[in-house]
């Protein structure tokens, strides 16, 4: 009895001591400064980007450099990825792109960083090691991409509604295998939801025959902004990267026939430039066959004249490649819908489409992205357009899932992109029959070197761009005989805007610049730690705070508030401002209104009709900055309006 009492007394004393110590610690904190005054919590907001090389200086460097180590043709995901990889290894790099960065396929993806659950299913049913290798490679690269550009990427839960009892264990095991093959790179574990929990998460789903749902995780990202960020990061690492420079001819050694460079034209000035290089890489995606034609031709010229872009065309659906040998062209169409078509922070996956495809419905930039179709073609179009049948096909599939009526008038935007599905052009049979179906094609990449030394990389997808670039630059090092280079380290490079990024940057930016949470969130998700530079433009003038859709209206009243409440656009539908446009022109090589409205921002992709309201102001601001003539302004205005009108509106 005595021992029990003693133990209780000892326990009480210990508890008292702990309480006293805790009380002392709590009261002693009053003598310390508040946490936001602690220097360790202070953030240095950049007010200017690293010294930017002007386009004029890049053109001069392109023309005056005696010989580059490597010339990369194509400024999409793979091309800019190659430029960054090669530059950071120590090579002297030139890259030219005939349009804007991501003006082709690289801006028209499903905005997913994924291994591909559909490929995993095919791998098992078809006993395909190629499909399985594709999944494993993509799962590894998925995590690397999110780490190098965390401001542009996010982990996205995706819900698969299940309407057959037998599918519950089938889909559950499939997603668990997906987690397993990701290994240490897995984002989050998949999990099963009951019918009631599914309806709570996604009340828009039809409940007829709904049994349960499975949630797995992949990544979501902003494709064209990532593309521009890769180009900018490559320039900041010493590469000579230029948009609107079109290769017109490959230069060949007169004795050996080896490709030793290219003749190119600056689209803006019509200046011609000769680019000499030890190695040349063809990274033009679905347009790879156009450069391969130049490679096969002893003169280095294309088989057919290049498109005449000197005047506005009545149609944008020109043919880029008449008879592709390497690329198996396929069109994928996406549409954008209001946010109520899927949960705010969770995507939906349709695994039971009428023709055996899968279809995604994903939250993206405050809207819902739905797609895609898979339509085989015989030719490669320059700028494919969605048809009404394509749009209706997606709406029809969506209606299978949605409880309320799916309406055509809800479509805010629609666009089409060419998938760069590939095969080895050296294996085409003599009769030239290449087939047209694409669903059975592995969405992998293909790298080969022609007899003339041209290195071509094509295929793949956004998720694996970094791996594709690494393999390509490895081949450049081999073909060029380069020595004493740094190893590839693009897995660890923080892209422009990811430097010093933290998950609290939205709050820190809002506090420092007195932004609304909506504006701060938008800027950080698209520009990362460089968003503060746009805020400096806001501080320069009231005009820079105007949203572009209102900027050409007379007698604008921006807002009525205290002086230090810098920008509060919660009352406006879209946060795209004059300040952001000026930043894009000064720091991101934005050269045309379409560059800004489609690719530096995603305005036209998100709401084509509303983007049309911003065209006049965009042309005016850019025209004033670049000293455009009235004729040039009118040309850009018509071109921009006509192009945006092809977005399903």
Curated annotation (Swiss-Prot):
Q: Record's Gene3D superfamilies? A: Alpha-glycerophosphate oxidase, cap domain, D-Amino Acid Oxidase, subunit A, domain 2, FAD/NAD(P)-binding domain
Q: Which cofactor does it need?
A: FAD
Q: Which GO terms describe its cellular component?
A: mitochondrial inner membrane; mitochondrial intermembrane space; mitochondrial outer membrane; mitochondrion
Q: Give one Pfam hit by family name.
A: DAO
Query: Which key words are in the record?
Result: FAD, Flavoprotein, Membrane, Mitochondrion, Mitochondrion inner membrane, Oxidoreductase, Transit peptide
What Enzyme Commission number(s) does the record list for this chain? 1.1.5.3
Which pathway does it operate in?
A: Polyol metabolism; glycerol degradation via glycerol kinase pathway; glycerone phosphate from sn-glycerol 3-phosphate (anaerobic route): step 1/1
Could you tell me which PROSITE patterns the record lists for this protein?
FAD_G3PDH_1, FAD_G3PDH_2
Under catalytic activity, the entry for this protein gives: a quinone + sn-glycerol 3-phosphate = dihydroxyacetone phosphate + a quinol
Q: Which GO terms describe its biological process?
A: glycerol catabolic process; glycerol metabolic process; glycerol-3-phosphate metabolic process; glycerol-3-phosphate shuttle
Q: Which residues bind FAD?
A: 69-97
| TM helices/strands, residue ranges | none
Q: Which InterPro entries match?
A: DAO_C, DAO_C_sf, FAD-dep_OxRdtase, FAD/NAD-bd_sf, G3P_DH_FAD-dep
Gene Ontology MF terms:
glycerol-3-phosphate dehydrogenase (quinone) activity
UniProt-annotated location(s) = Mitochondrion inner membrane; Mitochondrion intermembrane space
Which family does this protein fall into?
A: Belongs to the FAD-dependent glycerol-3-phosphate dehydrogenase family.
**Other facts:** Present with 1670 molecules/cell in log phase SD medium.
The protein here is known as Glycerol-3-phosphate dehydrogenase, mitochondrial
Q: State the species of origin.
A: Saccharomyces cerevisiae (strain ATCC 204508 / S288c) (Baker's yeast)
Please name the taxonomic classification of the source. Answer: Eukaryota, Fungi, Dikarya, Ascomycota, Saccharomycotina
């Amino acid at each position: 009895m005595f021992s029990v009492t003693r133990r209780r007394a000892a326990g009480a004393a210990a508890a008292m001591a702990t309480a006293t110590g805790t009380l002392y610690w709590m009261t002693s904190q009053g003598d310390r400064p508040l946490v936001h005054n602690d220097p360790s919590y202070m953030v240095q907001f950049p007010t200017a980007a690293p010294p930017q090389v002007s386009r004029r200086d890049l053109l001069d460097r392109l023309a005056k450099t005696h010989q580059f180590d490597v010339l990369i043709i194509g400024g999409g995901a793979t091309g800019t990825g190659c430029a960054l990889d090669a530059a950071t290894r120590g090579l002297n790099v030139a890259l030219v792109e005939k349009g804007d960065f991501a003006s082709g396929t690289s801006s028209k993806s499903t905005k997913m960083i994924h291994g591909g659950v559909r490929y995993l299913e095919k791998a098992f049913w078809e006993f395909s090691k190629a499909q399985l290798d594709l999944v494993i490679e993509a799962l590894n690269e998925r995590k690397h991409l999110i780490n190098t550009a965390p401001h542009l990427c996010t982990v996205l839960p995706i819900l698969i509604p299940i309407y057959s009892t037998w599918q519950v264990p089938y889909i559950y095991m499939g997603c668990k295998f997906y987690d397993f093959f990701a290994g240490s790179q897995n984002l989050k574990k998949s999990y099963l939801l009951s019918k009631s929990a599914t309806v709570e998460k996604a009340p828009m789903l039809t409940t007829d025959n709904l049994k349960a749902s499975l949630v797995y995780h992949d990544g979501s990202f902003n494709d064209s902004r990532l593309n521009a960020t890769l180009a900018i990061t490559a320039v900041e690492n010493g590469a000579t990267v230029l948009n609107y420079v079109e290769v017109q001819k490959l230069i060949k050694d007169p004795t050996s026939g080896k490709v030793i460079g290219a003749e190119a034209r600056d689209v803006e000035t019509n200046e011609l430039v000769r680019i000499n290089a030890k190695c040349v890489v063809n990274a033009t995606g679905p347009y790879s066959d156009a450069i391969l034609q130049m490679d096969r031709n002893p003169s280095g010229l294309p088989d057919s004249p290049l498109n005449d872009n000197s005047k506005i065309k009545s149609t944008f659906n020109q043919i880029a490649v008449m008879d592709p040998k390497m690329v198996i062209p396929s069109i994928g169409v996406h549409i954008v819908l209001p946010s109520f078509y899927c949960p705010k922070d969770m995507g939906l996956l349709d695994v039971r489409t009428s023709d055996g495809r899968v279809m995604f419905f994903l939250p993206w930039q405050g809207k819902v992205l739905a797609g895609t179709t898979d339509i085989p073609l015989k030719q490669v179009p320059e700028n494919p357009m969605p048809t009404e049948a394509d749009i209706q096909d997606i709406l029809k599939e969506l209606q299978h899932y949605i409880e309320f009526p799916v309406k055509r008038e809800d479509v805010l935007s629609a666009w089409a992109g060419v998938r760069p599905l590939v095969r080895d052009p050296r294996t085409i049979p003599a009769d030239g029959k290449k087939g047209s179906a694409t669903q059975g094609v592995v969405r992998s990449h293909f790298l080969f070197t022609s007899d003339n030394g041209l290195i071509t990389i094509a295929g793949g997808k956004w998720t694996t761009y970094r791996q594709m670039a690494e393999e390509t630059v490895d081949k450049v090092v081999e073909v060029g005989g380069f020595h004493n280079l740094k190893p590839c380290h693009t897995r660890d490079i923080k892209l422009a805007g990811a430097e010093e990024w933290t998950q609290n940057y939205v709050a820190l930016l809002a506090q420092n610049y007195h932004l609304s949470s909506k504006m701060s969130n938008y800027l950080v998700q698209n520009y990362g730690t460089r968003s503060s530079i746009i805020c400096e433009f806001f501080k320069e003038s009231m005009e820079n705070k105007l949203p572009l859709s209102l900027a050409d209206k007379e007698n604008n009243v921006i807002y009525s508030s205290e002086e230090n409440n810098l920008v509060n656009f919660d009352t406006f539908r879209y946060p795209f401002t004059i300040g952001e446009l000026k930043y894009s022109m000064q720091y991101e090589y934005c050269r045309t209104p379409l560059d800004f409205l489609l690719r530096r921002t995603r305005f036209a992709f998100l709401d084509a009709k509303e983007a049309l309201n911003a065209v006049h102001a965009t042309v005016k601001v850019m025209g004033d900055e670049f000293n455009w003539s009235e004729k040039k302004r009118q040309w850009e205005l018509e071109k921009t309006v006509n192009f945006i009108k092809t977005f399903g509106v």
